[in-house]
Design a protein with these regions (language model features):
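Bacterial N-terminal signal peptides that target proteins for export
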Residues: 1-7, 60, 110
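Classical Sec-dependent N-terminal signal peptides that target proteins to the secretory pathway
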Residues: 2-20
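Outer-membrane beta-barrel initiation region
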Residues: 19-87, 259-283
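Flexible, glycine-rich linker and terminal segments associated
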Residues: 21-36, 144-177, 183-188, 200-283
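Feature captures outer-membrane beta-barrel proteins of Gram-negative bacteria and organelles
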Residues: 29-31, 53-66, 88-102, 123-140, ...
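Transmembrane beta-strand segments that form the barrel wall of outer-membrane beta-barrel proteins
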Residues: 39-47, 69-81, 105-116, 125, ...
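Solvent-exposed loop/turn segments connecting transmembrane beta-strands
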Residues: 46-55, 78-90, 115-123, 154-156, ...
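Short acidic, gly/pro-rich beta-turn/loop elements at beta-sheet edges
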Residues: 67-69, 85, 104, 119-121, ...
Length: 283
């Protein structure tokens, strides 16, 4: 609970500061200069109870427009801790998104390749659907044949995850989500779990994800985590500074602005270590 209390206090300070918008906008402008081209760019800090912080940069860029949507690419680079050792992970993906005839909903498909500095390689296929209030994502992950992690005693695990998010009534700037995952163990039992949390848009360029990761696996601790994200361009709509709305749900809106948002997936590769009673973090 101390972790949650500290995170909430920090969030309150960030959004109550009279300079919050200016500070987050300056950070957003710096982020936009990190990766060339128009599109979505994000950098984040991932804070966890039982592990050192992770840092990442992610970008989404449009490849081509279509009559009903677009083709896009998403790529990211970040550090993470596995088996008490830091490593770097890169992701590269391509996808297609389609708008409904009235443009109030969006669906999409995507494919990714993930690679880390221990020569572990993985591919994934995903689908997504969203409107102004609800969002659904499903991803399947599988080790690539040319993954060399086995040579250093590591095994990439196949698996899947499902995520359903909904706007919180009267809080147009916050979503509640449930994210279930399953990883197929090789020399040990499978790993399953559920994340329960919330996404809160603190300012137009700053978001906080706060969740509890309930892991159904002995040897892997349940934990709270907080992910602070800075992004560019600024998002339209309500932020935490607007408080409680008079209306319960967001009105239906044109989803064209969502065509270059990031794909919700597990960018970190799930690893099983040989000769270790623990598997690893589940993200």
């Amino acid at each position: 609970m101390r972790f949650i209390t500290k995170t909430l206090i920090l969030s309150f300070i960030l959004i109550s500061n009279s300079y919050a918008d200016g500070i987050s906008e300056k950070i957003g402008n710096l982020i936009s200069e990190m990766v060339p081209g128009e599109g979505y760019t994000e950098t984040s800090i991932d804070l966890r109870e039982n592990n050192s912080p992770d840092f990442s940069i992610l970008a989404v860029r449009e490849i081509a427009k279509t009559d009903d949507g677009n083709f896009f690419t998403q790529f990211s680079l970040f550090n993470t801790e596995k088996n008490s050792s830091d490593r770097w992970v890169g992701n590269l993906g391509f996808g297609k998104r389609m708008l409904s005839d009235d443009k109030t909903s969006m669906t999409g498909i995507n494919a990714f390749i993930d690679y880390d500095t221990k020569s572990n390689a993985r591919a994934s296929l995903g689908v997504e659907a969203k409107n102004a209030v609800l969002e659904f994502n499903a991803n399947y992950y599988e080790e690539l044949p040319n993954s060399f992690g086995n040579e250093v005693g590591e095994k990439v695990l196949d698996g899947y995850d499902l995520r359903l998010a909904s706007q919180i009534p009267y809080l147009h700037w916050a979503n509640a989500f449930v994210n279930s995952y399953h990883w197929d163990g090789v020399d040990r039992d499978d790993v399953e779990g559920i994340k329960l949390g919330t996404d809160m848009l603190l300012t137009s360029t700053m978001n906080l994800e706060l969740a509890f990761d309930d892991k159904d696996k002995e040897g892997i601790e349940d934990e709270w985590y907080a992910k602070l994200q800075f992004f560019y361009p600024p998002r339209e709509g309500a932020t935490a500074q607007d408080g409680i709305s008079d209306t319960k749900w967001k009105e239906e809106k044109d989803m064209t602005g969502q065509l270059l948002t990031k794909v919700k997936r597990q960018n970190k590769i799930m690893i099983e270590f040989k000769g270790n009673s623990k598997i690893t973090r589940t993200d």
